[in-house]
Amino acid sequence: YIIFTKCPADLTESDKELYRNRSAYYSTAPVLFTYLEYGGIQDQFGNAIDPNLPIALVTAIADDSAIRTYLNQHYDVNKVIGFKDHHNFQASDIAPLMAESKAGKIQIVCTEKDQVKLLPILKGQPLFTLPVEHRFSAADQKLLLDDLRGLLSS
């Protein structure tokens, strides 16, 4: 299989066909597409984000454009601090944000990947994460599952 990930959820059939045609030069494998589906933002204690407070996004991922776009469409993002992928966070990186968060002025949001590295620094302060999953279209999911079932029953 050739799987194009992080596609727009509304990728048109004509756009998919363009990708399939270009891929055909290199492989006859079936071409599938995934899109990102975001879950509800929660902190490490299970509390939902306050929709009335602005958020500060902190990331250390290769390309944070999708999460930025999503958050800007749905929330009041008043700060974005982006670091290089695999950044080794230090308390000094986010000290001003921690002070604003403690004062109840902002909520710090990050990816699930970055949460692992940021939680020890925040020392019990709320840190919100935006869960994300890759999803196949119903047709692509059926094709993949049918093929897998066929392989497993052989």
Question: Would you name each region that the model predicts?
Answer:
Residues 1-107:
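C-terminal accessory "lid"/substrate-recognition subdomains
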Residues 11, 116-118:
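Short glycine-rich, flexible loops that bind phosphorylated cofactors or substrates
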Residues 20-23, 75, 118-136:
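A short, gly/pro- and small-residue-rich
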Residues 22, 100, 121, 147, ...:
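Residues that form generic nucleotide/phosphate-binding pockets
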Residues 64, 112-116:
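Short, polar loop motifs at secondary-structure junctions
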Residues 70, 120-121, 141:
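Short conserved micro-motifs at the rims of enzyme active sites and ligand-binding pockets
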Residues 84-88, 125-154:
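Short, flexible loop segments at boundaries between secondary-structure elements
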Residues 107-112, 128-131:
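Conserved active-site loop/cleft motifs that coordinate metal ions or position small ligands
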